[in-house]
């Protein structure tokens, strides 16, 4: 997807600029799978999938932000990754001196809507990514949260970068600090401001479809193209923020 790795779907000038200033790896050997297992690998510097699945840092783990903190380097986390505040996913963020948690991604239980407008949501969203009958379901909060994300400034990843810039502005004259700016995007659902999507045309004419299923492809060709287009738009947002 990224130009620096041969992607041709869109232009990613800011990722290109970052690649020019970075070490670029042509081979990648996976450790633990993404989400919390990968984060435990990165905190502790060792592979966790050999003995445990999805879960928190253990009391015996050496966490690099904590090691920095205990050695007089100020550590700060900015993230909209809501799994940090879930049962089983916690104990990562509190290894930092401070943290700013941005709300509203995916199924983050953010906005309280006791009686959601069911018919409105059924018309607006594809049936494959909607479940409003079960408040415990993974799809329940996404349409609710999206009702409160109306402008580009409302998007959680945009708020993350603004918070990171605030940290840099506040601490530009300080030394010995570490900032971890971590966004949930481009994780699904592939929801980006309209200006990043408007140039990408598809033949799909149905309700909003931006959350692919974790299974074999059963969608029509038009639906697949719509999902791809929304993913490309989200990558474009990430490049813009970078």
Predicted feature descriptions by range:
Residues 39-150:
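Catalytic-site neighborhoods of secreted/periplasmic enzymes
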Residues 1, 27-32, 77-80, 178-185:
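Short beta-strand segments
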Residues 11, 30, 55-61, 225-237:
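A short beta-strand-to-alpha-helix junction
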Residues 1-23, 32:
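Active-site-proximal N-terminal segment of extracellular/periplasmic enzymes that hydrolyze or transfer
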